[in-house]
Amino acid sequence: MQRRAFVIVLDACGAGELPDSADYGDAGANTLGHVAEAAGGLVLPNLQRLGLGSALALRGCPPAERPVVHGRLHPMGPGKDTITGHWELMGAITPVALRTYPDGFPADVIEQLRDGTGRGVLCNKPYSGTAVIDDYGEEHLRTGDLIVYTSADSVLQIAAHEDEVPQAELIAACQVAREIMRGEHAVGRVIARPFRGVPGTFERTEGRKDLALDPPGRTYLDELRADGVPTHTVGKIGSVFNHVGVDHEHPGATNPAAIAGTSRLIDELEHGFVFTNLVETDQVYGHRQDVPGFHRALQEIDRAVGEWTAALDPERDLLVITADHGCDPTTPGTDHTREHVPLIAAFAGHGGRRHDGPFADVGASVLRWLSGREADSLPGTPFL
């Protein structure tokens, strides 16, 4: 019987502040805990049954009677973004924080971007992704200039209306930006953000594309591939790793699409590793401080978890549910928050133990489950 492993990342579902959260302006952050309080209690029967309420105190989600392995994980390196969170889950630790641009990008970067794309630049400052198209979209349509902005994360984003800048041209512009944003100006990601509509009703499309840096070293994805284990990603994870260590990438720009893609792989995959990102708790609800929407997204995920656990064979399959960082929608800011993340791990013989450790324990456990070995050169201790 060939084994399989599934790691599901609930994007931005942080599980409480870290000792250094205050250094990032995130003292007291607790994404899941505060959503639970603000929602009047979480209604997540399947995640509760597995042990989410055993991992951390959550209103409406009491400790499970018979939990699987549960606990909280912490990052080993700096940062609080998608890139570093996913990299750390697979054992790649960034020794220094990726560069951010709280005052916008320097003049030489903007000049190179103008020269390389043949278009002007609007905005050039940290901005909410939805607000920036509301505030600059009309001028963009009038001038054809690209909307270039950043956030508290290490990212350069380019927004453009699909009727003004075709998708292929927008991606080409992002490729120009990716080459510029290396070396001293390196950012974790360059992101294409197409949008549609008319002034007052602009909305992002699902044509987002991420152009990342390569991970800073070998990862557990590389270890799995070296052992002949097929690696699959669902959603944005393939691009987060700049496609390094990934055999097959499956679409998942929305939670329904990523859930459906994961369900398909559960039904069809004979052997391998599936690494899924469920993005909407971050992209749609966390950054927009929408607590009811955040809870609804968790409930949609919970229903999928019920279907997945019914379909999986604990003797054959490892299921890990975790996150990459926080994005507490009850705090004044709209940026990510530096937090612990939850850990739920279901497999035969789990014993209901508590396990607290670094993010990299996830990758170490996947390698142990699928290859029966450890990678001495990578951080992480299996919780199997």
Regions picked out by a protein language model, each given a short descriptive name:
Residues 1-384:
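Feature captures the catalytic ectodomains and active-site-proximal regions of enzymes
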